[in-house]
Structure formats: structure tokens, C-alpha cells
Amino acid sequence: MKDRYILAFETSCDETSVAVLKNDDELLSNVIASQIESHKRFGGVVPEVASRHHVEVITACIEEALAEAGITEEDVTAVAVTYGPGLVGALLVGLSAAKAFAWAHGLPLIPVNHMAGHLMAAQSVEPLEFPLLALLVSGGHTELVYVSEAGDYKIVGETRDDAVGEAYDKVGRVMGLTYPAGREIDELAHQGQDIYDFPRAMIKEDNLEFSFSGLKSAFINLHHNAEQKGESLSTEDLCASFQAAVLDILMAKTKKALEKYPVKTLVVAGGVAANKGLRERLAAEITDVKVIIPPLRLCGDNAGMIAYASVSEWNKENFAGWDLNAKPSLAFDTME
């Protein structure tokens, strides 16, 4: 059987990425051009800046991905692309490049949900067994997803307000940490003590919903009040207390979901899945099901994960037309 090569594109936010996947599971290349340095001074992603950067580097990323994979344009079998959720301008750059490549070479175009990409990045660790449950944690999303089979995703719980990664970045900004703040808060948390009593919203409620706005507000109020009084607070202890509250919420809801949906596998994915504290809690507390977390290089936004997610769509021949458009608010269906 002839080898299949999928060329995948990811430009939903501030990473321009192009990857090549051979057959179902051999990631030959995963080129990522990060824009973090451009957005640091703004304390967050500026959509217009992100779009312009994507335009500047997308062609070079395609060339590098093909070269690193050791294939030519003529070897590509199909093109996969993120079409949502994300920043509309950023998404359109990847969509335009993917459609142009597919059209020029007469190839099928595979539409991929960005969050499905995060989830299916776990396929790089080992073949996934369905049904499974996934905890998706990133800068824009916090959700529990039930996956009955590859490509069939249903939300069973999600945040009512801030995403967990968003909360990390906002409290990081208050402390004067560098954007994105997640890694630094995690590192500082391991040097401090959980001495500040922050709220754990909805932790005892009988649902699978998350809420981080109250925790974020409590943190900001404590920090500002201390500043106004001229008091000095330990940054390490603040980070340790904040992260302890976040992880308590995530763990409580995940355990509740595992009780409700008896599965053998839990996938934890998204940018926040790189968090050392979260990985430690999962290893210590989730012992009755298999926990699969993508490698660090596949936790953040990257086209490799989009390639993995595209395989199930390829198998179903779920191809898009040339009218495929960006869907910035694209979401999985909710479990009824």
C-alpha cells in the first residue's frame, strides 16, 4: 500500500505551524514559528499582530516542514487545516495557505477542530482505546469531553467563565510575570507554600462545570490590597496557593466525570497539560484508569496535533469544499 502523507496547518492563535504525518502515526516534521516575543510587551496576544506574523512566515514553514520530512510537494496525499476555534484573522491565514496548496495539487482538504487536535495529540503516545474521557485545558478552553470513537466528541462539562490558562495569564500579569505566565507560575509554585486561602468555586456542586473568575478576582484583590497597604507578599507562596486552588478544582471535576462516565482512559491535553503540578496530581490521584498526556512538544499549539486529528476525518472521507471558512467560535457538541 502506498504511504499517505498529510500536510497539516495550524494558525489559530500565535503559533504558525506546519507538519507532515506519514500514515496514521509517524510524525515526520512539526515546524513551529512562535510569536511569543512579539506579544510579550502587550501582556497577551494582539490579533492583528498575530495575523501579520502568520502571513510573513507561513510559506517558509511549509518549505521547512516538507524538507524536514524528506518529501516533495508531489508526495503529499491530503491537506489538513484548523478552521476553528481561534482568532478569525489568524485562522484565515492558515486556511488560505492550506486551500491554495490543496487546490494547486488537486488534493482533498480535511477540516479539523483545534480542540480535537489537542485531544488527538495523545495518539502520539500510544493508540487510543475508546470510549475515553478527556480533560482539555488551555488558554481559551477548559472542558471535559467524552469521546465514544475517534472523531465523535461530546462536551460533558466546561468553564462558565475564564479558561484555566487565561486565569494563569491574568494573575501572572498582576504579579509582573512574563507572558505567557503559566510555566513561571508553575515553577514558582514549587518553591512556595499554600498559605493563602483562595476560593475553589463549584468544587462541591454535583455537576461537571468549572469556574475560575472568582479565584482570579480573589487573587487580584489580595495582591492589590497588599500593595495599597505597603505590605510585601511572597510571590512563591502566592503562586503555590493559586495553583493549589486551580488543581483542586480540576482534579475534583475530573474525578467526578470519571465516576459518571466509566472509561479506561483519561486524556489530559492542551497547553496547561504541560503544567508540572497538574501532572504530579494526576499521577498521584488518578490510579484506576490509564492517564495519557501528550509530550511537552505537542501540548502547545502545533500542526502535528492537527495531523493526528485529521486521520479519523480522512478515514470517514470527511473532506471540505473550497468554501470552507474560519469558525472562531467552533465548539464540540454538548452531551445531551
UniProtKB/Swiss-Prot annotation:
Q: Does the keyword Cell division apply?
A: no
The record's keywords, sorted A to Z, are: Acyltransferase, Cytoplasm, Iron, Metal-binding, Transferase, tRNA processing
List the CDD domains hit by this protein, alphabetically: ASKHA_NBD_TsaD_bac (cd24133)
Give the SUPFAM superfamilies listed for this entry: Actin-like ATPase domain
Query: What is the protein's major site of localization?
Result: cytoplasm
Q: Does the keyword Oxidoreductase apply?
A: no
Among the record's GO biological process terms, what is one? tRNA threonylcarbamoyladenosine modification
What NCBIfam families does the record tag this protein with? gcp_kae1, T6A_TsaD_YgjD
What role is this protein assigned?
Required for the formation of a threonylcarbamoyl group on adenosine at position 37 (t(6)A37) in tRNAs that read codons beginning with adenine. Is involved in the transfer of the threonylcarbamoyl moiety of threonylcarbamoyl-AMP (TC-AMP) to the N6 group of A37, together with TsaE and TsaB. TsaD likely plays a direct catalytic role in this reaction.
User: What protein name is recorded for this chain?
Assistant: tRNA N6-adenosine threonylcarbamoyltransferase
**Which organism's genome codes for this protein?**
Streptococcus pneumoniae (strain 70585)
Q: Its encoding gene is what?
A: tsaD
